[in-house]
Amino acid sequence: MTALDTLERVETAEIEKPIMQDKQIARGVEKITKTVGVPLTENAKFGIRGVDVFYGEKQAVFNVDLDIAKNQVIAMIGPSGCGKSTFLRCLNRMNDTIDICRVSGSITLDGMDIYDKQLDVVPLRARVGMVFQKPNPFPKSIYENVAYGPKIHGLASRRSDLDEIVETSLKKAGLWNEVKDRLHAPGTGLSGGQQQRLCIARTIAVSPEVILMDEPCSALDPIATAKIEELIAELSENFTIAIVTHSMQQAARVSHRTAYFHMGRLVEVNDTEKVFTNPDHELTEAYITGRFG
């Protein structure tokens, strides 16, 4: 039985096990002494060790150890407020923009400490791009949306080079054929799904090594979502991708590995098929079978 078969069975059949009560969930959290499954891997692009995240005095993420493999898709799932988006933002230091946020522990990118005090975050964020929940094209033309990053980072010395980057990025984002005859039209005039693919093209244009996606399909219709999911599969051949999603079906469709977060703890990480068909932790099983959420 595949991961998607398991989720379809859960959706269509009556759950035999009772809904987990708050006290049961709390006891389950108390039992989390370490992440189960296979949190560490070979060929790691990111190495995360002992990461804690605080907002003021409130701790949001607890002691995460995780490797993110090169040229794979890892999906991060869990209930709302479980810390998955907070953790994702640690990977390109977007949490630096929040004054009360503090990150401790170690995060390395190809062995480089990304929290080194001497590190310039601008080139880091070029290497580790991000696509947000809501499409956010610049109030510029389609062409200028994609060209902006390469201009800022000095990646094109001639107009012809810039034209090539724009075309290549739009093709990789699966958008070129839809916009090639109107490149100077406003990016904000595109449909929601097209805007999100434009944002992906904008990210690709600066030649990142990693793409972070925070709920990239939550504001899109099913057809646009399907196009984004197809795109993720294609992009994973050349990029490392970490995606936060509330859709377990989406995680099952697009990812190689899945990480389950609960109340700031990384509960379980394993191959996606294993997580959805035979999870090792009772909290993971309870979540994917709909006993709480």
From Swiss-Prot:
Note the superkingdom of the native organism: Bacteria
Q: Which Pfam families match?
A: ABC_tran
Task: Cite the GO molecular-function annotations of the record.
Answer: ATP binding; ATP hydrolysis activity; ATPase-coupled phosphate ion transmembrane transporter activity
The reactions it catalyses are: phosphate(out) + ATP + H2O = ADP + 2 phosphate(in) + H(+)
One of its GO biological process terms is: phosphate ion transmembrane transport
Residues engaged in binding ATP: 78-85
The record's family statement is: Belongs to the ABC transporter superfamily. Phosphate importer (TC 3.A.1.7) family.
UniProt xrefs under InterPro entries: AAA+_ATPase (IPR003593), ABC_transporter-like_ATP-bd (IPR003439), ABC_transporter-like_CS (IPR017871), P-loop_NTPase (IPR027417), PstB-like (IPR005670)
Q: What is the recorded function of this protein according to its Swiss-Prot or TrEMBL entry? A: Part of the ABC transporter complex PstSACB involved in phosphate import. Responsible for energy coupling to the transport system.
Location(s) in or outside the cell: Cell inner membrane
Q: What is this protein called?
A: Phosphate import ATP-binding protein PstB
Keywords assigned by UniProt? ATP-binding, Cell inner membrane, Cell membrane, Membrane, Nucleotide-binding, Phosphate transport, Translocase, Transport
